[in-house]
A protein has these predicted regions:
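Glycine-rich oxoanion-binding loops at beta->alpha junctions
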Residues: 103-105, 143-164, 209-210, 226
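Glycine-rich phosphate-binding loop
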Residues: 160-198
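Glycine-rich phosphate/diphosphate-binding loop of Rossmann-like nucleotide-binding domains
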Residues: 114-156
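C-terminal binding/interaction regions
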Residues: 121, 163-166, 200, 204-264
Length: 264
């Protein structure tokens, strides 16, 4: 719940001044001993705290998930395993789990999604990382178009989807092996491109390092690169860009943000 929501509820009598005081006293974080829940993050950044599930002891994960759900009415976890899902589900039956992206979440019903992000992959093997990006962006309120298996070994596949890609406020390009997809897309669109190298590939791909270096050294303009397999990071920053688009230029934001003729 945001500060304004608390004040509105005090104004309308939904909660008392004493209850509001308790809420503000636990700002800006809640101490659990093993974790400090950042209850002010949405106020500062516009997005609530997200749980990185991998490596967390079982009971810690369950407690963190419950507290963030109680705080925000929804919660997102990344890099979760099926066994962790079963544990969280015992305490929070409405939680859902996606076996492809390894995302664990409880999401508010009736959420309005705006703008558009295009998520593209070079190959089918890149889809788990792409889905982490796509589902993160959807959770944070963006419309997402998935355009999968359009890598450079069959460039005609990408060109057949170019209209949809060019309509997006931001493009996420997910690729392993040599990682060329991001450069190709960067040369075809006027939108920002978030490049995500994946660990997909044979020996000399070095678990994604080859793709990472290709993307960092791209000749195409307008490309930013996140870490290897970091779909969550790509989905997050793409949503920030997408919000700028629909905030300033209508549904997709293209008239003001990306239509250069508007600046003449």
């Amino acid at each position: 719940m945001e500060t304004r929501d608390v004040l509105e509820q005090v104004k309308t009598g939904i909660i008392s001044i004493e209850e509001a005081e308790k809420y503000f006293k636990k700002q800006p974080f809640e101490e659990l001993g093993y974790a400090k829940l950042d209850t002010h993050r949405q106020i500062r950044s516009g997005f609530p705290e997200v749980v990185f599930c991998s490596g967390k002891p079982d009971q810690y994960l369950v407690n963190i998930f419950l507290r963030l759900y109680e705080e925000n009415g929804e919660v997102l976890g990344t890099r979760a395993q099926a066994a962790q899902y079963e544990l969280v589900k015992e305490a929070l039956p409405q939680v859902s789990y996606d076996e492809v992206s390894h995302i664990l979440k409880v999401e508010k019903a009736g959420k309005i999604r705006q703008g558009k992000i295009a998520v593209c992959t070079a190959g089918t093997a890149d889809i788990p990382v792409a889905e982490e990006a796509a589902q993160t962006a959807e959770y944070f309120g963006s419309n997402v178009e998935r355009i999968y298996d359009v890598g450079v070994s069959g460039l005609h596949r990408l060109l057949s989807k170019l209209d949809g890609i060019q309509e997006a406020n931001c493009v996420i390009a997910v690729a392993g092996m040599e990682g060329a997809l991001a450069s190709v897309i960067g040369g075809l669109v006027s939108r920002p491109v978030i490049a995500v190298p994946t660990s997909v590939g044979y020996g000399a791909s070095l678990n994604g390092l080859s793709a990472l270096l290709t993307m960092i050294n791209s000749c195409a303009n307008g490309i930013a690169v996140v870490n290897i397999d970091n779909g969550y990071g790509a989905g997050y920053i793409a949503t920030q860009i997408n919000r700028l688009g629909y905030s300033y230029g209508g549904e997709n934001g293209t008239d003001i943000i990306f239509g250069m003729q508007q600046w003449n």
